[in-house]
Amino acid sequence: RISYSLSGTVIEQMELFRPDVLQSFVELAKTGCVEFLSETYFHSLSFLFNKDEFERQIKEHDQKIEQYFKQKPTVFRNTELIYNNELAAFIEKMGFKGILCEGVDRLLKDRHPNQLLKPTGTKSIKALLKNYRLSDDIAFRFSDKNWSEWPLHADTFASWIHKVAGNGDVINLFMDYETFGEHQWESTGIFDFMDHLPREILKHPDFGF
């Protein structure tokens, strides 16, 4: 499943300058195969300074998401995945079912990022952790000719994912939208890679996409 995190300000920019791009996201929403995450309207750090402003921005953002995409976000993504347990508890009280955060090795210790975790001090909200190694293989290493795995093909990447079978709940790949076409140019083959990846992942009976 694909999740998009679009700030309120980027939606405003699309309204003003690229309504065709905004419409492309509307069409994606209609497929039922993508979801839109909640975040602060201005991609801000407001939770660290003013929680009332933080809550106001989230509500304003989610109204924008519902206006265009007819979805009410259930998962929250803070700016740059900044996280602590206090934030998770606050977000849970606002009605969210999940929150995204980094899968930091030194904090996970004997756990791994492919597990759904319940943050301390919460009742039922789940923390969805970024698998940074697999994410960075696409976001940063994909076109690196000095990388031992270059050139990376979809079937190879899917085989790495399949190794998690039976030892995790979900594999979260987080990357900036600019990964596709800017960090990794079209000439690298990134678009063909992404086109083939879902079907390669689905070749294993234990996996969904």
What are these regions (language model features)?
Residues 176-190, 194-200:
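Glycine-rich, aromatic-lined ligand/substrate-binding cores of catalytic
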Residues 138-144, 183-186:
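Short conserved micro-motifs at the rims of enzyme active sites and ligand-binding pockets
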Residues 1-74, 81-136, 143, 151-167, ...:
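Catalytic alpha-helical scaffold of carbohydrate-active enzymes acting on polysaccharides/glycoconjugates
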